[in-house]
Amino acid sequence: MEVVLNEILPSSFSCTPATDSHCMSSLFQHRDPMLKKRDDFEDILEERRNSSDLRYALKCYTPVVYKGVTPNAASLLKTTVLQSDQLHYVVDQLSKETGVAADVIQEEASAILEEMAHRQQLSTVRFFAFTLSKAFKALFRSIHVNEEGIQRLQQAIQEHPVVLLPSHRSYMDFLLMSYILYTYDLVLPVIAAGMDFMGMKFVGEMLRMSGAFFIRRSFGGDKLYWTVFSEYVKTMLRNGMAPVEFFLEGTRSRTSKSLTPKLGLLNIVMDPFFKGEVFDVSLVPVSISYERILEETLYARELLGVPKPKESTSGLFKARKVLSEDYGSIHVYFGQPVSVRSLAQGKVNRCHFNLMPRHIPRRPSDETQCFVNDSAYSLVRAQEENMVLKPWVLLASLLLQNQSQGLLLDELTEQAVWLRGLSREYGAFLNWPDHMAPSEVVSSSLSLHRDLVKISGGRVQLALGGQGLMNQAVVVLSCTSYRNQALHVFLRPALLASAIHIATSAKKEEVYNSFSFLRNMLSNEFILCPGATLQDFEEACYLLGKTGALQMSQQEMQVTDSGQKTVNFLTAMLDPFLQGYQVRHTHTHTHTHTHTTKQADTFAWSLRYYELLSSDLQKNALAALLRLGAIRKIKVYVGFLHPCVPEWNLHSHINRLINSNY
């Protein structure tokens, strides 16, 4: 079906390659997988299976520390925070504004700090080391860690304050991080945790004594809380007593897609460098890849609207049955430490921070905020690039594109081998055991995920039959969480493949404008660095051309006959998202948000297109439609109205995208 580009692209979205900028190229360049050496991995559970867990927990633990660490810094942490110039300044300001005595506000600050602060004790750490060894050996076949990354981290800890930035796909993440650092005799991190965990009797206090400090999910306009919190984190960095660990995405990803980074804590940890209080800060992105996610069913049900269960000690004990399950392997990749000093070179003028005393709070300048935002996106990209993909990720991608009939086992194996080659060409960090026959690899993966697939008459299908609509949707959304792990590998070529199809001509400028529109529309859905449209376009051209799917001249580009299979696969990867945006827009008229969501859900159920039921997809689609001006939000007495903007007519635009015969 032909699509007129001018109908799709509002004039404000039209841009040319000459006017676009690049995004933090210091962290990301075009990758040729044949030129990049991957670090070697070590299975840290292998030794645990062959030696005493008690001896491991009670081992001599003497980690190397930051060369500038202040003696007794840990014991003086609370005192240092409460006596800080910035806290005193804010207390005095609040006292003047509210008329409340400064002593009363200071006591409130002390209470906030008492509720927040960690109290790390080695005895508790040893208890966790013993307990987690038992649990991990029961749950996982192996835990692989890149040794070179550990060596780089050990060196970084001695030279500068370190901030650990793990990806966040499971509750297991922060426990796993501390377990790994203890195994390698590295300083245990101080971890930012949500208040939800503090409410767990016994367990919450145990987490506090193993290095967790607890913060509210939202501070609102609470200046005192923000000041105590920021001073607490910055004091730890200035003193260098331990690495600070937090999740850049802010919360667990229920979809296995990277989430838009939150900037609050990143602003805080960069502030001591901006103000010249430390020479540098090292940011270490960490990628944690699970072969099978412990919470896969829980996440799928949450995405379908089932309320998240409250964290509780009793719930933890009820979850003990997972210990009898096989969750495969984990890969943990510690990335290259990123120097804030190097990142900021030529991008942030630190002289501005010397124009007023350090203790006076100030809002970040536009220049600084832009730098922090770009850094955050680039760090999440670094996490994505070092995610280790398992064979099941490829199998799930293929099965989701063949939900109705499934694939014969031999055909699935053949397709998986083809997709293995394509993903490697695109630079995927793929953990495919080449010493095994492809049929064995596929059979092993299907066995591990047998709850999600069925094999009948030599045909492999998703396990959808006779389970009821809710259970069928849970299976599909569980599978999408694995497919989503590979989206960062295929996203940019997929955007280009779709752009080529919908462009009015094969001219590069027309294709670029289509690419720019699609990228802009889906920027709530994926990690797409602001201002990097041209860089992403060039990467997509490079990858499609490299695999022979794209033929380019100076002015035009076309899909080759041999590349049609690749293009079909890539466009099918984006299809569920475009379908979801279409449904969301179709059922967003002059109704409240709740009514609209119910309408969209009902329509998706009727289609049995279960991916459209994901609350994450619907939320992102609504945000994109609002941002693009396709709808507007009007606050009324109950709920929100989302009337369409007639002149935008996005419905017809997305319809054309969806209904095009890829």
Residues covered by each model-derived region:
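Membrane-interfacial terminal anchoring regions of lipid-handling membrane enzymes
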Residues: 1-662
